[in-house]
Amino acid sequence: FLQNLMGINILSAGFMTGSTANLIALAFIFSMAGTKVYYTDWMFANLPVVLTAMFISWLIGPKLLFRLTNKEKQPAIKGGIDVLKKQLDAMGKFSALEKKGAVIFGIVVLMWVTDRFHFGLFGFEINAVMAAIIGGVIALLPRVGILKWNEADIPWHLMLFSAGAYAGGLALNDTGAATWAVQSLFKAINFDKHINFWVLYTVIIAVMMYSHFVFTSKTMRTIILIPFIIALAKELGINPLALALPAAFTIDWVIGLPISAKPNVILFTAGQYSVLDNLKYGFIISTIGIILLLIAGMTWFKFLGITP
């Protein structure tokens, strides 16, 4: 169950559509730093880090921290595979609605992956949010769609929260509050503006990574920290992308506590592990994630032109 928790959260970090908070972070980078990050930019940069982290977590978790006894390795349900096969067969073949759903999902993913080519092909760009909206509209169209309007459950409260959070983050930049906070911090701690880039990079990644132990909302972490990081980079004369994008890569690493994300809560209710187990495993893998992002920053991200 803990390995499922790692997989769900860490693998979602490999894609910018893994969470709304990722998109908000990219919107800050574009509006405050003027740098556009495309779907494939994020995927090519962070997916190798994520896959490496997953492999290491598989070695550390089941192989070292939570070794299974021979008895535990045996199937918990007698004939479990046969039961699953029967349930799968009972579902029958793909229905017309399921095929439509797969096609609509494929269209949305295609729009996401090809976002950098839209302007050249169509004269305008379909960003990740618009692609999702288009998919939703298609799903609700008569005959073509798979849902009726009265069946759609739109979480307006989440949309309003995300919009308000984004507006709040932009206000930090537009009012100069983020820059003022950075300058005040420099004066208060007598900060050396000539600090080594990699020292600063490591501190920022660590703060972003470990902050999920304090802030349970990914969106809240994003609107508090990403504008501050961009303002910090500007104040030091560093390309904001070099600090803000790697920091954004940590947003979905909410693996330390059962309350850190909805999937964590669902998995915890199965009663297969304790809060301490989750905390211990999450802290270890989070620390490994910081190390991996540091190594990637010095090698892979540098090759991609993200870090100097």
Task: Label the predicted regions.
Residues 2-4, 12-24, 31-93, 100-103, ...:
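Juxtamembrane and boundary regions of transmembrane helices in multi-pass small-molecule transporters
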Residues 11-21, 171-178, 211-224, 253-262:
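Short helix-coil transition sites and intra-membrane helix breaks within transmembrane domains
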Residues 149-183, 197-210:
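Core transmembrane alpha-helical segments of multi-pass membrane transporters/permeases
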Residues 192-248:
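Hydrophobic alpha-helical transmembrane segments of multi-pass integral membrane proteins
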Residues 124-136, 188-200, 241-257:
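Structural signature of hydrophobic alpha-helical transmembrane segments
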Residues 50-55, 97-108, 123-142, 155-167, ...:
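Hydrophobic mid-bilayer segments of alpha-helices in multi-pass membrane transport proteins
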